[in-house]
Amino acid sequence: MPTIQQLIRKPRQPKVKRSKSMHLEQCPQKRGVCTRVYTTTPKKPNSAMRKVAKVRLTNGFEVISYIPGESHNLQEHSVVLIRGGRVKDLPGVRYHILRGVLDTQGVKDRKQRRSKYGAKRPK
């Protein structure tokens, strides 16, 4: 434990809070270009083929982001908008691609939670 004199000389430093989605640089979303679209498998208790894309952002960072919903139209050079939010069972995936924005189509025949998947209201 430091003495009062030591604290006067060198005060305590506040802990730096690190962002969980630092490549967004405090923005709610960022635009980027897909450099690779592929599937990967989740961690131990789960089993699936999760769709992910490697995206080069406008600020130069390259991040791995998750493509939510059933089926997608993304391929290399597609322009996408990403938001923060990790996928718990995919290590290294800390971002989500927004559906129904820019080159990404919304999910077809989606009835519930449509706004999250860029689906229009069914007639």
Swiss-Prot record:
SUPFAM superfamilies linked: Nucleic acid-binding proteins
Source organism, top-level taxon: Bacteria
Comp. bias intervals (Basic residues): 9-21
Modified residues (3-methylthioaspartic acid): D89
Gene Ontology MF term list: rRNA binding; structural constituent of ribosome; tRNA binding
Coiled coil stretches, renumbered: none
Gene3D superfamilies: Nucleic acid-binding proteins
Region of interest called Disordered, as start-end residue ranges on this chain: 1-28
Keywords: Methylation, Ribonucleoprotein, Ribosomal protein, RNA-binding, rRNA-binding, tRNA-binding
GO biological process, one term: translation
PROSITE patterns to which the protein is assigned, alphabetical: RIBOSOMAL_S12
CDD domains in the cross-refs: Ribosomal_S12
Assigned GO CC terms: small ribosomal subunit
The protein's assembly and partners: Part of the 30S ribosomal subunit. Contacts proteins S8 and S17. May interact with IF1 in the 30S initiation complex.
Described purpose of this protein according to its UniProt entry: With S4 and S5 plays an important role in translational accuracy.
Family statement drawn from the similarity comment of this UniProt entry: Belongs to the universal ribosomal protein uS12 family.
Protein name per UniProt: Small ribosomal subunit protein uS12
The organism's taxonomic lineage, starting at the top: Bacteria, Pseudomonadati, Pseudomonadota, Alphaproteobacteria, Rhodobacterales
